[in-house]
Amino acid sequence: MEIRADEISRIIREQIKDYGKKVDVAETGTVLSQADGVARIYGLAGAAAGELLEFPHGTRGLVLNLEEDNVGAAIMGAFEHIREGDPVKRTGKIAEVAVGEELLGRVVDGLGSPIDGRGPVNAKHTRKIEIKAPGIVQRKSVHEPMQTGLKAIDALVPIGRGQRELILGDRQTGKTAVAIDTILNNKGNNLYCFYVAVGQKQSTVARVVEILKQHGAMEYTTVIAANASDPAPMQYLAPYTGVTMAEYFRDTGRHALIIYDDLSKQAVAYRQLSLLLRRPPGREAYPGDVFYLHSRLLERAAKLSEKEGGGSLTALPIIETQAGDVSAYIPTNVISITDGQIFLESNLFYQGVRPAINVGISVSRVGGSAQIKAMKQVAGSLKLELAQYRELAAFAQFGSDLDKATQETLARGERLVELLKQGQYSPMPVEKQVIQIYAATQKDENGQGWIRQVPVEEVGRYMRELVEFLDARHPGVAKTIAEKKALDDGIRSQLDAALREFRGVFQVEGQA
């Protein structure tokens, strides 16, 4: 056999030319066990906490436990097909989510993937889900108002941009309604809204999206939904996904609002994960770091300093109480983290006082400095008067012989309660709130309240028609209040004149 050196060298040259240096190295482990969306994996010694893993069929997992001989991971998505012995790959990436204007108007799941049937989100930017909250130097104190459009909140428990205000109450007391009203009220205010639904029924989330669409609010809102049927890891992660999306607007010098509905269900999902990962249980079987779960989330809401762009992220976390018990574990945790709370009471709700805010224990620790001057001027004594009324009303049930001063306080309190009632999905601009509260709290030329002679059941109609009357006859008054944000003597005299004029008109209509 003839050996042809040139042919051999040609073959070798071709082989060398086709040789690639690229070697695919992947650290692979094996599933030891899988139960309820939590897998134990052997062989991933280099895995990092919070790292994403790749299971068969493209399913993702998140590393939560690092143990001596195995790794505990939460499976993101369907886990029924994952079996013992399945291979698992490290990705080397920490969980990230798409951010940007492209997400506005969309409904996404707990990992930021669209679930509204409108195709992919072509976002230009991504961000890590777990990042550190801004430090003290990067922050500025809360000083700009974030109007909710609800008289009871804007007057008594005002919220500022960058604040964390907890909404808590029993189920079916109007917690979500308060949050949705806040979104609707900020149409045209350059506030980008994020609604995170955790553990809700799909029908409930669909209804919220429909309401937002009807009022044209989806244009500036993103809905992040981890429904009741989704695995616990998705419910645990959804609030972090939402806050990461909202932070993009805060960090680009804009203003954002995030609503967590609700964090009780996130805590339950985290408890489920922790127990499956065999972490030691504490009070009410929650793990020891359940406080940190919420604190690291809510600390990411902030008002940034001018040097950092002056953006803000306001958070409205919602907590569901059991039988009005605000001293339970999760409610007390979140109360201590936030800058105030709005407590909704089922008794008030069933009495027809809606929004059913208990003024006595609802408080805003930093919002007072963000309230506009006009509102401070008219609503200064409102909280005290309502508290006195509640106290006297409790005693008045037992005695019929009341002195004149007590009767006067009760009559005034009844009218103030009526004033603060407001229909669902009908938020009101702050200047109109100021006009209504001025009419309810100020006195006329005879030293009596402007609405003292109005029957209690007519107060709601009086307030509605007063605003309509001013819009028609004195449109400049509301406009001036909106511009000046304060009541000077000129505006007060204009309001008094308008109220005198309206008193005659309203009485005629009432008698007719």
Swiss-Prot record:
Site (Required for activity): 362
SUPFAM superfamilies named among the record's database cross-references: C-terminal domain of alpha and beta subunits of F1 ATP synthase, N-terminal domain of alpha and beta subunits of F1 ATP synthase, P-loop containing nucleoside triphosphate hydrolases
Known catalytic reactions: ATP + H2O + 4 H(+)(in) = ADP + phosphate + 5 H(+)(out)
Binding sites annotated in the UniProt record for ATP: 169-176
UniProt KW keywords: ATP synthesis, ATP-binding, Cell inner membrane, Cell membrane, CF(1), Hydrogen ion transport, Ion transport, Membrane, Nucleotide-binding, Translocase, Transport
Entry EC number(s): 7.1.2.2
GO cellular component terms listed in the entry, alphabetical order: plasma membrane; proton-transporting ATP synthase complex
Keyword Cell inner membrane: yes
GO molecular function annotation: ADP binding; ATP binding; proton-transporting ATP synthase activity, rotational mechanism
Primary site of residence: membrane
Compartmental location: Cell inner membrane
Superkingdom as given in the UniProt entry: Bacteria
Membrane topology of the entry: Peripheral membrane protein
CDD domains (alphabetical): ATP-synt_F1_alpha_C, ATP-synt_F1_alpha_N, F1-ATPase_alpha_CD
PANTHER family: ATP SYNTHASE SUBUNIT ALPHA, MITOCHONDRIAL
Record note on quaternary structure: F-type ATPases have 2 components, CF(1) - the catalytic core - and CF(0) - the membrane proton channel. CF(1) has five subunits: alpha(3), beta(3), gamma(1), delta(1), epsilon(1). CF(0) has three main subunits: a(1), b(2) and c(9-12). The alpha and beta chains form an alternating ring which encloses part of the gamma chain. CF(1) is attached to CF(0) by a central stalk formed by the gamma and epsilon chains, while a peripheral stalk is formed by the delta and b chains.
Family statement: Belongs to the ATPase alpha/beta chains family.
Function, in words: Produces ATP from ADP in the presence of a proton gradient across the membrane. The alpha chain is a regulatory subunit.
Protein name according to UniProt: ATP synthase subunit alpha
Gene source species: Anaeromyxobacter sp. (strain Fw109-5)
Gene: atpA
